[in-house]
From Swiss-Prot:
It comes from the Eukaryota. Belongs to the paired homeobox family. Bicoid subfamily. This is Homeobox protein orthopedia B. SUPFAM superfamilies: Homeodomain-like. Gene3D superfamilies: Homeodomain-like (1.10.10.60). One of its GO terms (molecular function) is DNA binding. GO terms for biological process: forebrain neuron development; hypothalamus development; mammillary body development; neuron differentiation. Signal peptide: none annotated. Coiled coil: none annotated. Isoform 1 and isoform 2 are expressed in brain and testis. It comes from Danio rerio (Zebrafish). One of its GO terms (cellular component) is nucleus. A motif (OAR) lies at residues 296-309.
Length: 315
């Protein structure tokens, strides 16, 4: 067993150790700026706090882990780093979105080669596009885009030229048949070319016209009908069944006269007798070329209307 002296020495050693710890604690508090004075009974808590402190790399003992200001500084630094990273990411995305595609500028030699290939075919395959791209120093995608734009321009130009060149696109046809150029020229030259001094339709060939007596009130209508019939007769020689004839009777007298007596060979005078009507042939100007337009001729329709009014006035 230990003697009494040994126990006293041990106790004095423990006191010295406690005093050293208190001094060390006071020194720490002075460095940290604390104002609280320690108590001799807080040796264990002081040792635990001193031993439990964790120091960051590069920090002094004054910036121990028990300092809340140091923790706030670390958190602030982390937040700043995160904000910088987020700002860099958003800035990169905005730059990618705002980045414009490069516009290719073709040289005259490249355009000449592309136009030559376009003249050969409007739809080149991938092999032809790759060969052309290697030849003129472009990428295959650029060549493909150029051909697409060139085809669109060609189609637009073709559509506009067809609109201005087509004869039937600007003016409506209204259902009228298209005439050949030669037939149209002949018809335009010969239509309404009959004159009063023409010897083909001399008065000698119409013996019954001089004996025809028409009331004065119908002189104007008869003149208009005669002018229309002369205009239609001037288009060509009438066939054998086209002699316009009528039988006019006043108060049942049965007066008959031949209006147009044909004088050409092979033509038979046609006369239709009726009680009180004037009948005209509905197929006036029915030459082989006029069969296409006789139903739509405005002149023939007007002539028929005038003949109808004349016949109604006689009745």
């Amino acid at each position: 067993m230990l003697s009494h002296a040994d126990l006293l020495d041990t106790r004095l050693g423990m006191k010295d150790a406690a005093a050293e710890l208190l001094v060390h604690r006071e020194a720490l508090k002075c460095r940290l700026g604390g104002t609280d004075s320690g108590h001799p009974g807080d040796l264990t808590s002081a040792t635990e706090t001193v031993e439990g402190t964790t120091l960051l790399p590069g920090e002094e003992i004054s910036n121990g882990g028990s300092n809340p200001n140091g923790m706030q500084q670390v958190n602030a630094k982390d937040q700043e780093k995160q904000q910088q990273q987020n700002s860099n990411q958003t800035g990169g995305q905005q730059n990618q979105q705002k980045q414009k595609r490069h516009r290719t500028r073709f040289t005259p030699a490249q355009l000449n080669e592309l136009e030559r290939s376009f003249a050969k075919t409007h739809y080149p395959d991938i092999f032809m596009r790759e060969e052309l791209a290697l030849r003129i120093g472009l990428t295959e995608s650029r060549v493909q885009v150029w051909f697409q734009n060139r085809r669109a321009k060609w189609k637009k130009r073709k559509k506009t030229t067809n609109v201005f060149r087509a004869p039937g696109t600007l003016l409506p046809t209204h259902g009228l048949p298209q005439f050949p150029s030669a037939a149209a020229a002949a018809m335009g030259d010969s239509l309404c070319s009959f004159h009063a001094n023409d010897t083909r339709w001399a008065a000698a060939g119409m013996p019954g016209v001089s004996q025809l007596q028409i009331p004065p009130s119908l002189g104007r209508q008869q003149a208009m009908a005669q002018s229309l019939s002369q205009c239609s007769l001037g288009a060509g020689p009438p066939p054998n069944n086209m002699g316009l004839s009528g039988s006019l009777s006043s108060n049942g007298s049965g007066l008959q006269s031949h209006l147009y007596q044909p004088t050409f060979p092979g033509m038979v005078p046609a006369s239709l007798s009726g009680p009180t009507n004037v009948t005209g042939s509905p197929q006036l100007c029915s030459s082989p070329d006029s069969d296409m337009w006789r139903g739509t001729s405005i002149a023939s329709l007007r002539r028929k209307a005038l003949e109808h009014t004349v016949s109604m006035s006689f009745t």
